[in-house]
Amino acid sequence: MTDQMFGLDGRVALVTGASSGLGAEVARTLAAAGARVAVAARREDRLAALADDLGGVAVACDLLDPAQVDTLVSRVTERLGGPEILVNVAGGFAGACPAEEEAPATVSDTLTLNLVAPFRLCQTAFPHMVAAGRGAIVNVSSISGQVGIPGIPQASYAAAKAGLSGLTAELAVQWAPHGIRVNTVAPGFFRSEITESLYDDERSHAWLRRNTPLPYDAEASDIVGAVLWLAGDAGRYVTGQTIVVDGGWTAR
């Protein structure tokens, strides 16, 4: 029964932002569940090594380049077949900056990377999921799209991640008749290349621990269970939701 609920039985899955951190962990988890995984990111050397480990395929893609985004799904389809699972992990922001000082180019790039590119990938994956009669899209957001975080000003990033939850709800309603589910996972703070400095600094680490009810630090492995649940049949009646995985941060 458990294998039926969480097994992905040869379904093609595309994971963006997969060269390291959460994206790589998601790719490993889906592959372990039986998916045939295509990994996409800018860092092609890391990507190739991961794809070899998983028995999948690597496709280099810069999500700030619309031409590369528009062809990513077709490049995956040529090598593995059309994706039935899409996990939009890639994202990020230029750095903490007061809203009134954010440069227009920075705002544009942040919105493109975190919202526009995932939307476009959903659009290009859509016909393949329709043809398969089913599909699961999991967008990876952040608690920054749910609440403001004092001391870490990131307005354009917060706007993009909040927009991702709105996009998720809208696509879920539009595409439900095709058997396509669309959900978002919104992680809180967890150890990664990007956040390591927060954990290495005694003061910021104490701040994280003080504001997180669960009494331990999270790793990427603490986030991927929600993604696997939403990607497979265990979550077959869940759509349009933003699942917050934050150790209780937003429940305070």
Set out the residue ranges of the language-model regions.
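Conserved glycine-rich cofactor-binding loop
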Residues: 19-20
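Short C-terminal tail/terminal secondary-structure segment
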Residues: 2-5, 93-96, 228, 239-252
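A conserved structural motif in NAD(P)-dependent oxidoreductases
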Residues: 212-223, 234
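Residue(s) in the substrate-gating loop at a strand-loop-helix junction
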Residues: 142
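Active-site helix of classical SDR
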Residues: 122, 160, 168
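Short, small/polar-rich loop/turn modules that mediate ligand/substrate recognition or access, typified
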Residues: 176, 181, 238-240
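Substrate-binding pocket helix/loop in short-chain dehydrogenase/reductase
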Residues: 97-99, 103-111, 137, 208
